[in-house]
Amino acid sequence: GMASKRPEDGPHLVYLPETPFCMDKFITDVKEVYDRLGRCVIAVSEGIVDETGLPIVTKYMENIERDDHGNISMSGNSALGDVLARLIKDKLKIKRVRADTFGYIQRCFLGCVSEVDQQESREVGEKAVHFAVAENKSGSICIKRTGDYLVDYELIDFCCVAALTKKMPSQFINEEGNNITPAFKDYLRPLLGRNITEVAYLSSGKIPKIINK
């Protein structure tokens, strides 16, 4: 959503684990956007849950894997995307629906690395070596944000972070539960740095469709 410049730019819908996910409302949201724009780009977290807190994806997984802390492993699993794409096709009768499940793509593409993230990740490594070698301490390096955007690095005990999940604050999610808010963009903007890719637009209008099959 940070790269969007115009109201019609995608992603048009964003779904996060902090808001219970309802299939019926999802279809209603998609239909509203598709009827208005003729397209709909949706970003869905793999960790979205139903009203009971159960991850949606677990309903469609044959084998549920867990990490060492007991958390359900959902990264890179395409089941959720396939289910939602099929649901849209069936309910809205839209022929061209595609779901792309990102695994390591967004983590390894150097063309989209934030300069801020690069710098801070190096500094985290340096701090870790310092505490381990110079002070003979163990733990996890915590990045603590201060002011508009400054950071401090602190060493905290593993028990403060292991197996725990940091939740998205409610003020970062809109009332409908299907997108981010300006407050989230304000929070995220300093983290992206200055080298964010600009979105290009075609100046010409759409060409009328001539061939119908």
State where each predicted segment sits:
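C-terminal non-catalytic interaction/assembly regions of soluble proteins
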Residues: Y60-K213
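Accessory alpha-helical/coil subdomains and C-terminal extensions
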Residues: M2-R98
